[in-house]
């Protein structure tokens, strides 16, 4: 049986750590001038994949 291929789009979007899968943050790419500083601060921290989506992301990454 051949090896499972990694979904390349998923490989570019997710980073796997010891027990969590890190993802990029939405609402931080453009049109930032009209967004309040408080909202930008709240969006600043690390973002992780929700536990309901972890199995699907792991399958895409071949982990």
Swiss-Prot record:
Q: Which UniProt keywords apply?
A: Ribonucleoprotein, Ribosomal protein
Which PROSITE patterns does the entry link to?
A: RIBOSOMAL_L35 (PS00936)
Query: Does rRNA-binding appear among the keywords?
Result: no
- Provide the Gene Ontology terms for cellular component: cytosolic large ribosomal subunit
Name the InterPro entries for this protein.
Ribosomal_bL35 (IPR001706), Ribosomal_bL35-like (IPR021137), Ribosomal_bL35_CS (IPR018265), Ribosomal_bL35_sf (IPR037229)
Q: Which family does it belong to?
A: Belongs to the bacterial ribosomal protein bL35 family.
* GO MF terms held by the record: structural constituent of ribosome
Asked whether the keyword Transcription is assigned, the reply is: no
Q: What is this protein called?
A: Large ribosomal subunit protein bL35
Which gene name belongs to this protein?
A: rpmI
GO biological process terms held by the UniProt record? translation
Coiled-coil zones:
none
The record lists the organism as Campylobacter concisus (strain 13826)
């Amino acid at each position: 049986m051949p090896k499972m291929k990694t979904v390349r789009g998923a490989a570019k979007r997710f980073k796997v750590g010891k027990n969590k899968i890190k993802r990029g943050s939405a609402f931080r790419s453009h049109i930032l001038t009209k967004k309040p500083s408080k909202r930008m601060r709240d969006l600043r921290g690390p973002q992780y994949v929700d536990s309901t989506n972890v199995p699907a992301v792991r399958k895409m990454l071949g982990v």
